Amino acid sequence: MPWIDGRLLVTLAGVMLLVQAVCWLLARGLGWKLARSAVICGWLAPLIALTPWLAGRELLVPCDMLLTAVPGVPRTEVSHQYDVLNDILYQILPWELEVRHALADRRLPFWSDRLEGGSSPWANPQAGVLSPLQMAARAFPIQHHLLALLALKLLVAFQGTWLLARLTGRGRASSLLAAAGFSLGGGLFSWALFPVTAAVAWVPWLAAGVIRLFRRPGPRVIATTAAITAALLLSGHPETAAFGGLFAAACGLGLRRRAAGLRRGFGAAAVAALLGFGLAAPHLLPFLEIVPDSQRAGDTLTQTLGSQPWSLLFPPSWFDYGFAAFVLSPLSPHAYGRPYQDPFRGPFNWPDSETGYAGLVALAGAFVALLAVRDRRARPFLIFAVVSLLLAARFLPLAHLLWRVPPLRVPAYSRCLMPGALALCVAGAFGLDLLLSKRRLPVRAWIGLALAAALSLAVAADAWTLALWALLAAAVLVARWRPRWGGLALAAVLLADLVPWSRSFLPRGNPALFYPRTPYIEAFAREAGDPAVWRGAGAHYLLYPNLLSVYGVADFRPHNPLAPARYLRVLTAAFGFHPTMTSYFSPVQNLDHPLLDFLGVRAVAGSLSVPPSLTLQAIDGGRFAPFTLLRNPDPLPRWFFPRAVDTIGAGEVERWVAGMTDARRVAILREEAGSWRPAGGESPPPRPLLASPGHVVLKIPSAGAGAGAGGERLLATSIVWSKGWSARAGGRSLPVLKTDGAFVGVRLPAGPSRVELRFLPPGFVLGCAAAAVSLALCVLCLLSGRAAAPAPRRRGR
């Protein structure tokens, strides 16, 4: 087995060259050149951090947990230390696969039949349909997608942070140390495999662009910053983009040239932001359309702050209950134990709690900057780093102020620690410049170093942390004698600190457990049938949602914070399936409910520990024990004509679904139907002429004798309702209603023999128009504007 997978490495080098060209162009657009040292170190960072995975013997995927999640996998020894990263297997990779399937079919991923009863990957930011880095990583097989994507994130984040530090006047060595601290620290590695870090990698670039706009605004800088803004907004995590925008605004305001005038810089930044939003509008507008009705919005808008007693003498009481420990994250690599190795003793989980750690070198530099550097340019970074900690820890005076505005309850404020870690690294560069200078260090600098070490060791005084501080102190002493050697010594301390620490966040998955296709899965997929018409599911927690989509089976169960709340209420009433933001996983129960027939579920995964069903039939003959394969004998196709139609109010949906006895008897909402009532009676089901995700053409048979021939009928479907669905027949649009409170229904007039259903993400057309206008304006800026004036550089730095 070779030490390095040559094919993987060559492909990675080619894709990184393309991304490097983009970074070079962005830097030129901002009036800078990327130094050779920044380019070389930006390439070395992913190679150093990811070498164990480049051989291809282990996957950068936590797939070992599938040993118990997929029936029929041969037993082997695996580690479950990375099971907290289960969203990678149940959300991120299934969404990515659906995007790849759509692109392979030469269609845009507007809709997926397999995911969550039907959903739109386009409107889901974390699917990363238009994420620049995810698009580049699609050159790799799906099992290496996360590895390639992380390498690209490291490249972009490193060079962007170097550029930001240089724009603040930092020296070459301290800028490289700041870039290494951010790209190898918790700001990137705590959530290394998630879309959130694809967004945060662009934050230093945005901050650099905004600083340039406040200092020397020009057309090319505006266009370049707009492109960076669009890349950030398209990268899969809107709340991180919002926090990154706040950080960039703080940088621009704090580092502006007073002679340039606030109004001019603010105006240029506003124009760049508007153009960036316009470029990203084809994705942003559909996302904003679905957010208000999502599970995430409903759960977070109702959350409250803790009511524990407050005491001035007890600092943990200054924060919301359970959040105070977030303030410790920058202080030690082992503030909550060794990541994924020791028992966890921090807030919530490893990824959330460790986000704020940027290394002891950055911490020491930040304390030196705080106490000994009299440079106003350091203030925005120091202030933002502190504020990000207070937001993540829910400092009660600040939290109560935010909670007065309901929409401000929605963001996960722990994500603010990512730009906070970036701020800490750049602030640390100010202190490192002083430590690496030939000037005599003031006493305040030594006090800053001592204070940083004391606080860090008060949090965790293990042998490794003590050794790191001893080496850091020795590096500072070397820097007093030979600054260049001191810089190299600090780099060695940083790598010794962060490389093993960052690698501890990365799973080493067994390739044989990457979505294994077992005989049970093969039999299940055959029984479930065509995903355009039929579905499968797992009883209780079996074959958890989105897992089946990887094997080509449509599943009605959502596992997505953007799932429509109305759909989840229907599933709760029928099956007790009620995932929330606090209770993330939920079982499916009561599989004898008629809604299972309505949803077109043909195959169900069961086990000997699941309560027996009265309606489902075991068809496996016991050959998959302890698992069972169950058949539903009476599923309805995805579209049908109901036997009877009830009219109910919107507030009666859950009660009606809970009392449902016949899948062919459906309900429509009185608020939508008004006085209209469809003709009833049996009718043959429509025949699909085309059944592509998001586009269905049905041949409508003549109404049966008892179906009220000549009257309007209701075409019922089990497609999850969304604003983007439309219907046409005979050259005219048809009204689309909700059936059973959460599914698409069509008011079908008498006469048409064909009906067409199509999904277009709501806001997509308007977004495309906005993108076209913004793109034209950006091109005009690039063609008409002069090259950005280069920022002044100091010799010898």
Residue ranges and their predicted role:
Residues 95-102, 112-141, 326, 331-341, ...:
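Short hydrophobic/aromatic helix or loop-helix immediately within or flanking a transmembrane segment
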Residues 47-57, 103, 136-144, 173-194, ...:
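Membrane-interface helix-loop junctions at the exits of transmembrane helices
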Residues 68-69, 297-306, 463, 498-684:
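Extracytoplasmic
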Residues 1-32, 195, 201, 213-230, ...:
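Contiguous transmembrane helix-bundle modules in multi-pass membrane proteins
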Residues 602, 625, 663-793:
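Active-site-proximal, structured, solvent-exposed surfaces of multi-pass membrane proteins
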Residues 2, 66-103, 107-109, 278-371, ...:
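Periplasmic/ER-lumenal interhelical loops and adjacent helix-loop junctions
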Residues 117, 127-131, 135-159, 192-198, ...:
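Loop-to-helix entry region of an early transmembrane alpha helix in multi-pass inner-membrane enzymes
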Residues 42, 158-168, 172-257, 268-287, ...:
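Membrane-embedded helix bundles of polyisoprenyl
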